[in-house]
């Protein structure tokens, strides 16, 4: 069976930029920890998953419709405008892009949506007759998991391939209810406020009792516990906004056809790639 590896490029960049020692510089004195970690992780993920197709997708710097829904969406993210260049993850993107070109792996930055939307589009369009592996630490992708779609949480030798069983055991809901679950509890990573008094266990029990978010809202007046009933009734608009922020659909144009993502293994080391693009000196 074909296997498409979708890499959340911005997520991986941040993971490597902040997870690697910050004093790694090359022969020119340029910080390269993000680039070094990114390329090494990407090559290891490819070896782990043996994909037939690969694409790396990045978030561009732009407003999107989610900000129109909620002005507070992702406002908890760092403001890089006042930081020196060596402290900004994006400063290493040119080298990462050069490495991807050398590896002949297609990549793109979003202009009017988020990379999440592209990855959802690929998963929903192509996940019925091939495996899709989404490499990201972002739990939003759990809602896309099914018998063919998996989420790879890369942590080197401790990496985890998350399936529907993982989601059910960890959160008490099936993947197709995960977006509703997250709408109820909120998402601190994206600054999405949940409903006061509703934690993971309460959210899971509500979804078990009423099926989905609309079922919960339709029956909110019948919820036995007064405080919970009032929280749901007062938070109905917030819940619908959260759902729109979190739910991923197949509603955007994709940057590449499936044929353009075909991957031809190169069997290269990280050092070989970085030397070829001039980030490291040859020995």
Indicate residue ranges for each PLM-predicted region.
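Acidic, divalent-metal-coordinating active-site segment for phosphoryl/phosphodiester hydrolysis
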Residues: 139-140, 201
